[in-house]
A protein has these predicted regions:
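Glycine-rich phosphate-binding loop of ATP-dependent small-molecule kinases
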Residues: 1-129
Length: 129
């Protein structure tokens, strides 16, 4: 019995199949006038960019938009916490990919930047609304 010791070969075969499935799903979404949000969350250097790169490789660039989410800009900070996400919701047939999400405020800003209790509680209420 022969066992392949080359992990790259099977990986590339499987990845090519996944790319095909992603492409088919994007076309179906467009034809059915559906929209989707993909929110990636994770530590810095955890692979979020690699996931976005693989999605980008498979999809027609006219059908999706990637939004890197960092600290809110001055104009964003003047609005409710979720405003910057509301303004980036996809239109029918489109996909929005968020590189970090609304949960980041609860996960990262709370620990790293000392998000005040009142803002933390308000964020939870807004997310669950």
């Amino acid at each position: 019995m022969s066992v392949s010791r080359d992990p790259i070969g099977p990986y590339h075969d499987h990845l090519a199949l996944l790319h095909d499935q992603l492409r088919i799903a994007q076309i179906a979404m467009y034809r059915q006038n559906r929209k989707a949000i993909i929110a990636l969350e994770g530590y810095d250097a955890s692979g979020k960019g690699g996931v976005i790169r693989e999605l980008s490789y498979a999809w027609d660039p006219r059908g999706f938009q990637v939004y890197p989410i960092g600290p809110p800009a001055m104009t964003e900070a003047a609005h409710p916490f979720l405003w910057r996400f509301w303004n980036r919701l996809p239109t029918p047939g489109q996909i929005a990919v968020f590189d970090r999400s609304w949960y980041g405020r609860l996960l990262v800003e709370r620990v790293e930047q000392g998000l005040p209790d009142t803002e933390y509680e308000t964020s939870i209420v807004e997310i669950n609304a």
